[in-house]
Each structure stands twice: as C-alpha cells, then as structure tokens.
Amino acid sequence: LDRSSAASDVYKRQQLNYQKMKEAAKYFVGEHDFKAFKSSGTSGKNSVRTIYNVEVKKEGERIIIELTGNGFLYNMVRIISGTLLDVGLEKIKPEDISHIIEEKDRTKAGKTLPAHGLYLVNVKYEEWV
C-alpha cells in the first residue's frame, strides 16, 4: 500500500495501525478453508490452502504484505490484503480473522483490493521424481 499510488484511494490517507496488521497476519498462517477469501461466484469446491508465512513490513510510506503458501484461490491475496487493511484502519480486530476463517463468510472479509501494486515475486515447485 503506497500513499502515492492509485491504491491510496482505498484508505484515503488515514493512518494505518501497522502493529495490528502485523498481529493479524499470524491468524492466516496454517492450513485453513479460505472460502471467505475467494471471490464470490468462483467455481471449485476445494478452498483449503496452506499459508506458510504472512509478513507485513513497513518501508517508508509503504506497507508491504508478503504471502507464501502452497496455492492461492482467485483474488485470495487481494482479499487477505483488504482484510489486513480493515485491521489497520481498526474496522475489525486482529483476532476477528480466526472467526472470519471459521465462518467461511465472504461478506465478513475485507474488500478485494485493486490489482495495482500486486506483484508475483517468486514461484517454487517441488522436484518431480
């Protein structure tokens, strides 16, 4: 999230609670049914994924969100980021993340953030034997 980018409209220059975002990130780690974090209307029955790490970092005016996992649902990263943004804006509490995951209700998760500023950094594959 960069205050100089078009994505800045999403949080309208409000101060984000970076520490709460970092705290909330840990609730995504592990194997969960991420049904609440995929676009509504998306086909596919299996929404179980494993998130190995979610890191929230501050670099100047930017907040960087890095996710590592075994796969991602359609718009999952954008919705997780939108949910972390809601935590940073103090619309929801960090511990609410576990309830959103349990309830599997898309309407409880954050907005789907725009793709602007979203980058795929690395893809790793296990060796095939």
Question: Regions from the language model: what does each represent?
Answer:
Residues 1-7, 11:
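Single conserved hydrophobic/aromatic residue that forms the stacking wall/gate
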Residues 15-129:
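Core RNA-modification/binding signature centered on pseudouridine synthases
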